[in-house]
Amino acid sequence: MSGLGDSSSDPANPDSHKRKGSPCDTLASSTEKRRREQENKYLEELAELLSANISDIDSLSVKPDKCKILKKTVDQIQLMKRMEQEKSTTDDEVQKSDISSSSQGVIEKESLGPLLLEALDGFFFVVNCEGRIVFVSENVTSYLGYNQEELMNTSVYSILHVGDHAEFVKNLLPKSLVNGVPWPQEATRRNSHTFNCRMLIHPPDEPGTENQEACQRYEVMQCFTVSQPKSIQEDGEDFQSCLICIARRLPRPPAIMGVESFMTKQDTTGKIISIDTSSLRAAGRTGWEEFMRKCIYAFFQPQGREPSYARQLFQEVMTRGTASSPSYRFILNDGTMLSAHTKCKLCYPQSPDMQPFIMGIHIIDREHSGLSPQDDTNSGMSIPRVNPPVNPSISPAHGVARSSSLPPSNSNMVSTRVNRQQSSDLHSSSHSNSSNSQGSFGCSPGNQIVAGVALNQGQASSQSTNPPLNLNNSPMEGTGISLAQFMSPRRQVSSGLATRPRMPNNSFPPNIPTLNSPVSMTSTACNNSNRSYSNIPVTSLQSMNEGPNNSVGFSAGSPVLRQMSSQNSPSRLNIQPAKAESKDNKETASILNEMIQSDNSSNDGKPLDSGLLHNNDRLSDGDNKYSQTSHKLVQLLTTTAEQQLRHADIDTSCKEVLSCTGTSSSASANSSSGSCPSSHSSLTERHKILHRLLQEGSPSDITTLSVEPDKKDSASTSVSVTGQVPGNSGIKLELDASKKKESKDHQLLRYLLDKDEKDLRSTPNLSLDDVKVKVEKKEQMDPCNTNPTPMTKPPPEEIKLESQSQFTADLDQFDQLLPTLEKAAQLPGLCETERMDGAVTSVTIKSEILPATLQSTTARPTSRLNRLPELELEAIDNQFGQPGTGDQIPWANNTVTAVNQNKPEDQCISSQLDELLCPPTTVEGRNDEKALLEQLVSFLSGKDETELAELDRALGIDKLVQGGGLDVLSERFPPQQATPPLMMEERPNLYSQPYSSPSPTANLSGPFQGMVRQKPSLGTMPVQVTPPRGAFSPGMGMQPRQTLNRPPAAPNQLRLQLQQRLQGQQQLIHQNRQAILNQFAANAPVGINMRSGMQQQITPQPPLNAQMLAQRQRELYSQQHRRRQLIQQQRAMLMRQQSFGNNLPPSSGLPVPMGNPRLPQGAPQQFPYPPNYGTNPGTPPASTSPFSQLAENPEATLGNRNSMVNRGMTGNMGGQFGTGINPQMQQNVFQYPGSGMVPQGEANFAPSLSPGSSMVPMPIPPPQSSLLQQTPPASGYQSPDMKAWQQGAMGNNNVFSQAVQNQPTPAQPGVYNNMSITVSMAGGNTNVQNMNPMMGQMQMSSLQMPGMNTVCPEQINDPALRHTGLYCNQLSSTDLLKTEADGTQVQQVQVFADVQCTVNLVGGDPYLNQPGPLGTQKPTAGPQTPQAQQKSLLQQLLTE
């Protein structure tokens, strides 16, 4: 503490002022302030006295806390008192002499300095605030080589390295200058610091370049500095504040020997990709190539019975991400023994395109070569390391060492290192472990990891980990002591890395390698480049057996672990009879890795073979969804899968064989598994295990079950077991997952299992109840059951309604459970056929037959819902001889919505089943297929027209026909029979491709793309579709089952004729359209699209018969005539529009978005003749020409803007309008909704169009695209025929999907799209929805579709808009269109022409009604004039 006289209150003491430093002290008038300042000063002095590390305080930019200083002072005083007391008690009186060490120092001041300096091992110097050395001790010479005189009064910076000047200044100058924060009492503070700086060594005297270099040598000195802020007066000299420094040499770190190491890069299969030897070369040792090779060889060399460290590390790394091995030895050619250890890390490149890889660093331990591997501290991440703490107290000696849980490597290591005394026990345990790890090592680190993981978690992993391996035998397991417990706490031991004693003891014989097999099974997974590791199977097994313990956090480990677990199905883990299958395991592992990769890729959407289980994708995506599946089933499935993998020559691509159906490990949420092709064994064989499961309820059987497959023949049986029909496996999963053992479920399952494939082919239909039960189960099942059997045919209607109602609830669950369905759908190998819906007894159909990758997954739950109808559809398709051809439903994924998908899916499935199924690979499969087809054919052939029609309705085929789905199918399948359905299918094809416009169909893939197929509208279309139609949601147009070919049974002549006529009409229409479009090409970009589409459509047209030719000629004539009329009408329209002040929507606008839904008038003509043909009063017969209709009604609505619009549109459609109509109008007219290009030029006419007017031109600037929606006023038109069609919804439902309504651009949906879809024959179902968009988009509809029905005047609410009443009934659909708003109709006419063709085929009314303006969309079935009669042909056949 400062002396009494030192107080700042003493004015006579000059020191006091200096100490205060603050001018405030002298000026302070308040004693209080003075007291505070004095208090602060003392506190700071206290701090200096108390702490040698005041530098800690200095480094702060804030003053030290007073309380802390006082507290420390108190503590220090107390400590001193205690020390004094202790001293007094221990002092020996004898030593109280003058020279005693305990007496006061008698060393004189002069001799103390040198002694202190000598003791300091450094030199002492003082630097003033200007940086000059005021004093330096003589011993500086021994440190820096300078004499004392040389340095005195020189700048300290001359001997400091430039880089250390700042640090020195920081200590020299006041804190206020350094930190920028004023410290009021700074002048009174003494600061101590320690820092390192480089001091220049005195260069040699001899000059020379070398000396110049030498002069730059610096010595790193550690400086301890104390700042003396107070000036010191000594001998009359006034020493200002200065820095007192003591510099000493830094203790030199021990010379670091160059580390000899090299790095390897391995892929996820463990293969070395590259070796980096740069550090070895840098070490400069000779012969590094040799010991690099020897080291790698030793690293990959098996350790006795245990796998090599490379394998062990690989497993551990894949599981945990990092691993390190114990030391392993190798001998160089010269006899030198070296040891090395390896550390590995799993690296994930940033680029998703790059595969993860393992970086390993191999460090040569020359000094430690003598150490045993156990002693190697570098062992790294060995599992034991992690676990040892678990029970370090237990010494290995306890003999507990046996824990099987010890990773083999660990246990070995542990055993060797822990106590060889336990050798046998330890070994056995270690062995079991090793077998674990080895086995796993052989395959996947997973096993090892599993064991290790358990250890890591500190669980008695031995039990949890190994039990699946049947390690229970080891006493360790009984004890439940985890390996970690008996293992030495040393970390170095890595699980599975430790050298394993080769003495197998314990229950496991030396061959314990058998354990390897399970591991190997696991290992098979382990190779997966996917990062799925076989070891996971172990985990999964554990989890299965042990439940929570098993998880052991495996999944937590790494994505790899998770995948591994999924991959390693418990079955893999199942311990198989002790077989040394290390090679097999390795191969399996590699195969499995590839398989897993393929599985993963399949998830990515790569097609998997039908063999692959859809489960894989689902499981992987569903992650935990299947974790619930019963352990028993999972193990059962996995076991078989494992065996399949092991025994079957598995294609690396993981083709059919690899599908491990059941391998969903409950532990790992994502179990991606492949399904083994069922072809390997008969159904009954495959079902044996399932039967057993049903009979035996206890999970305890799993092990035996899993072991049995091993006993079975290698590939075929085991594969077959695993390969149980994917559907079946799915069923099993489902059953176990739901764990419902309802008698009914069992009955269904047993029924399916008891039936052989052949039997199943002929199995009676399941009742809907059964189906329902199954479906419910299915909630947790894979979507795909291999139940494509079309045999089950619940009454069509029942199926329709019930399937929808029954399955809709399930669909949501399916969607949730089967998120991977879509992906699976992409996988051809997924059991699409199964998706037929396990509900059907047809499950028996071979998976090979029904690989139907089809969109079963795509179909999703709906596919299941659809399954029943699908079966029928399938049968129908077969009849047409296209049974297997089923196109893959391009739209299946997108379009198929729950209910709607049901039917379309069915079609697709049926057609795709064959395609995807690929011809059955086995004779049995082919025979089955033939039998199925024959049955279908015979069944259908036995039906009369009425029954077939009912079937069609039940299946929604009629709707499909209307939607044009069948046409697409026919395209894909050469029409083998002249069945009308094929013909109809042909027709939609024509349109489908051409209209790739923005119409929803654009989303469709495959033949449906062109189709308006409102698929996109599926979810979006507001249209409410009646449940039956619902099957084809607004997207239905595309959805129509492709396979819905009508029963081939003797096709009605009527149907054939209708088809032919329709096709003929379509061809003519296409030709006419093309011609017109050519004219319009310049005007409307849409026109161009249409044209190309039309051309495409035309090409596919089937050969024409005489009837068709005649029809075509008639149509050509009528079209030409119409064109002339249209031109005239257009001119008239232009005149009228001008006269009306543009009141009429520009003809091109036709945008009158069929705003009044053009209620299809009477039935659309069923005959090739355009509905308007000869019906238009005063107009030439409506030719099929797309525009003809527009021209026909011009007068009718001349007064009405609508009629005007129609004419204008019609006239201008092809450049015809060009003369009178604004180019914009023309463009609008020609723009096809698909193009979505609606010139906004229409705005001119906009004034005439009131939002309410049905005529509102869709082309009107996009803002008016809503016009279509406005059009709904047409709802007034809705005739009862519209039925379920709601006008508002109808607008959306229009075949054109009313892109216009929804989309600012009326034309967005392809005009023709609607045509293909609009054709829905069934009473203007959802197809109408599709048509609406067309209407709005019809702007191009100037190409009138003869098939388009104009709204009947009656239907039109607005009298002005109404054409003469006769048009409704009299006019063909084309005329009807005209009758609507001329402009609108004109746009629609072209679309409708196509539609009408379709309509003619299907039955004009519904279609025409659909074509009606969106708003009105109700098909105006009401006026059934000749058209109604005409439409009756197809409708009679197709609809009631």
UniProtKB/Swiss-Prot annotation:
Sumoylated; sumoylation increases its interaction with PGR and prolongs its retention in the nucleus. It does not prevent its ubiquitination and does not exert a clear effect on the stability of the protein. The modification Phosphothreonine is found at T1179. Residues 361-567 are annotated as: Interaction with STAT3. Its EC number is 2.3.1.48. Residues 422-444, 661-682, 1415-1440 have a biased composition (Low complexity). Its main location: nucleus. One of its GO terms (cellular component) is nucleus. Coiled coil: none annotated. A motif (LXXLL motif 3) lies at residues 633-637. A motif (LXXLL motif 4) lies at residues 690-694. It is an enzyme of class 2 (transferase). There is a cross-link at K732, K774 (Glycyl lysine isopeptide (Lys-Gly) (interchain with G-Cter in SUMO)). A motif (LXXLL motif 7) lies at residues 1434-1438. InterPro entries: bHLH_dom (IPR011598), bHLH_NCOA1-3 (IPR056193), HLH_DNA-bd_sf (IPR036638), NCO_DUF1518 (IPR010011), NCOA1_bHLH (IPR028819), Nuc_rcpt_coact (IPR009110), Nuc_rcpt_coact_Ncoa-typ (IPR014920), Nuc_rcpt_coact_Ncoa_int_sf (IPR037077). A motif (LXXLL motif 2) lies at residues 112-116. Residues 23-80 form the bHLH domain. GO terms for molecular function: histone acetyltransferase activity; nuclear receptor binding; protein dimerization activity; transcription coactivator activity. There is a cross-link at K846 (Glycyl lysine isopeptide (Lys-Gly) (interchain with G-Cter in SUMO2)). The modification Asymmetric dimethylarginine is found at R1073, R1091, R1124, R1131. Keywords: Acetylation, Activator, Acyltransferase, Isopeptide bond, Methylation, Nucleus, Phosphoprotein, Receptor, Repeat, Transcription, Transcription regulation, Transferase, Ubl conjugation. GO terms for biological process: cellular response to hormone stimulus; positive regulation of DNA-templated transcription; positive regulation of transcription by RNA polymerase II. Nuclear receptor coactivator that directly binds nuclear receptors and stimulates the transcriptional activities in a hormone-dependent fashion. Involved in the coactivation of different nuclear receptors, such as for steroids (PGR, GR and ER), retinoids (RXRs), thyroid hormone (TRs) and prostanoids (PPARs). Also involved in coactivation mediated by STAT3, STAT5A, STAT5B and STAT6 transcription factors. Displays histone acetyltransferase activity toward H3 and H4; the relevance of such activity remains however unclear. Belongs to the SRC/p160 nuclear receptor coactivator family. The C-terminal (1107-1447) part mediates the histone acetyltransferase (HAT) activity. Contains 7 Leu-Xaa-Xaa-Leu-Leu (LXXLL) motifs. LXXLL motifs 3, 4 and 5 are essential for the association with nuclear receptors. This is Nuclear receptor coactivator 1. It comes from Sus scrofa (Pig). The gene is NCOA1.
